[in-house]
Amino acid sequence: MPQKEYHNQATWESGVASMMQNSHSGVNQLGGVFVNGRPLPDSTRQKIVELAHSGARPCDISRILQVSNGCVSKILGRYYETGSIRPRAIGGSKPRVATPEVVAKIAQYKRECPSIFAWEIRDRLLSEGICTNDNIPSVSSINRVLRNLASEKQQMGADGMYDKLRMLNGQTGTWGTRPGWYPGTSVPGQPNQDGCQQQDGAGENTNSISSNGEDSEETQMRLQLKRKLQRNRTSFTQEQIEALEKEFERTHYPDVFARERLAAKIDLPEARIQVWFSNRRAKWRREEKLRNQRRQANNSSSHIPISSSFSTSVYQAIPQPTTPVSFTSGSMLGRPDSALTNTYSALPPMPSFTMANNLPMQPSQTSSYSCMLPTSPPVNGRSYETYTPPHMQAHMNSQSMTTSGTTSTGLISPGVSVPVQVPGSEPDMSQYWSRLQ
C-alpha cells in the first residue's frame, strides 16, 4: 500500500512538472494528468482494456488509473464497437466519412427499402466492403445524410410543382404575375398577352379562352393542382342537414357510435360530422346568449318600482282628509253601521322602522290608498294610528295626545309600505303592544 501511494505521488509530481513545462496541460478531478487536445497514451488505453477484461467496472478503472469516467467509457465503447483502441485523427477535425460514394449508397439503400434503419445501413456498408471500421460513418451521421436527402427531395418536388403551375399559366418569367393568374381581365392600354380575342357585349370587355381541347385540359389540370393545395369546404345537402339537426335536437354531444351511425346514414365522413356538431354547438351558444339578453330586457321593462303608487282601479281612492288621520264609519262590506270600519292613509316609505309616538302628522304626508281593518271597540287613539287597549289607558293618559279621539287602527310605523292587519281581540293586542314597546 505505501508503495502504491508513493507511485501515485510520483505520478502526480511528474504530472505537475509536465504541466509547468507545457502551459496547455492540466490535472483532472481524480489527480490524473492530461494534456489538452491530446489523447491518452496507448499504454493507458491498453490498461483500461485489460482491467475491463478482468471484470473491473468503468468507475473502478477510473479511480485506479486516475482517468475521467467519460474518457474510460468512450474508449471502452469504441473498443467494443470497432475492436480498436487507437484514437481518432489527432489534430484538427476528423476526415469526412460521408463521401459522395457513401452518400450515393445510402440513398440507394433508402430507395430500395424506405423503412430501413440507420444501423442497418451501417451494417450493409460494412458487409459489402464499401467502408471499413476506420472510415465507417456513425449512426448519427447516417441519419443526418438521410435528413438531407429528404429535404432535397421535398425541395425538388416543390420546384417541380411550381414549374408545372408556371407552364399551365403560360408564364416564362416571374411567378404569380397578373396576366397569368387572371386570364379573364386585361390591363387597359396594353395588348392582350394571352392572344385571346376581345368581344364587345353588354358594355364590358372580356377575354375569351380558346375552345380547343388543350386549353380545357390545362384548365382541368390547374383546378386539380389547386384542389391539392387547399381542401374545399364541405357542402351539405338538405337531407343531410335535416338528419344532422334532428340528431342535434336529441343530443348536443353524440358519441362515436352515434356519429358512425349518422355517417353511414347520410354518407358523410365521421370527422366532418364531428366538426359540424362542434360548429353547431357554437352557434347554439350564441343564440342562447341573445335569447337571455332579450329576456332580461323584457323583465326590466315590465318591472314596477316599489315607490310608485297603486292603481286606483284596484284600490278605491278616498277624499283627502283635513286631519292627519281620516276616520269614516259605514258599511263598506255590508256590515251594519254599528260595525266600525277604519280607513287610514299610510305615510311614504322612510329609511328607518321606528315608532314615532308624539310627532304630529302633516296632511301633505298622506298617500292615496286605504285599507279596511277588523272592527274594534271605540277607544282613544294616538298619533300615527297606534292602537290602545282599555287596560292600557292609565299608561296612555300620561303622554300627550296630538289628535282628538275616535278609533285608530293598529299600524306599524311609516317605514312599511304594505298595510299590516292587527288582530282585534284585546288579549292579542296587549301582547302586540308589549312587543312594540
Swiss-Prot record:
Region ranges (RED subdomain): 101-149
Listed CDD domains: homeodomain, PAX
PROSITE patterns, per database record: HOMEOBOX_1, HOMEOBOX_2, PAIRED_1, PAIRED_2
Residue span of region PAI subdomain: 26-82
Primary location class: nucleus
Region (Disordered): 183-220, 396-437
Keyword Cytoplasm: no
DNA-binding among keywords: yes
Function: May be a transcription factor with important functions in eye and nasal development.
The organism's place on the tree of life at top rank: Eukaryota
GO biological process, one term: forebrain development
Family that this chain belongs to: Belongs to the paired homeobox family.
Gene3D superfamilies with a match to the protein in the record: Homeodomain-like (1.10.10.60), Winged helix-like DNA-binding domain superfamily/Winged helix DNA-binding domain (1.10.10.10)
Bias kind Polar residues: ranges: 187-213
Low complexity bias (residue ranges): 402-427
DNA-binding region: 23-149, 229-288
UniProt-annotated location(s): Nucleus
Keywords assigned by UniProt, alphabetized: Developmental protein, DNA-binding, Homeobox, Nucleus, Paired box, Transcription, Transcription regulation
Gene Ontology molecular functions: DNA-binding transcription factor activity, RNA polymerase II-specific; RNA polymerase II cis-regulatory region sequence-specific DNA binding
GN (gene name): pax6
Entry-linked InterPro entries: HD, Homeobox_CS, Homeodomain-like_sf, PAIRED_DNA-bd_dom, Paired_dom, PAX_fam, WH-like_DNA-bd_sf
One GO location term (cellular component): nucleus
Entry protein name: Paired box protein Pax-6
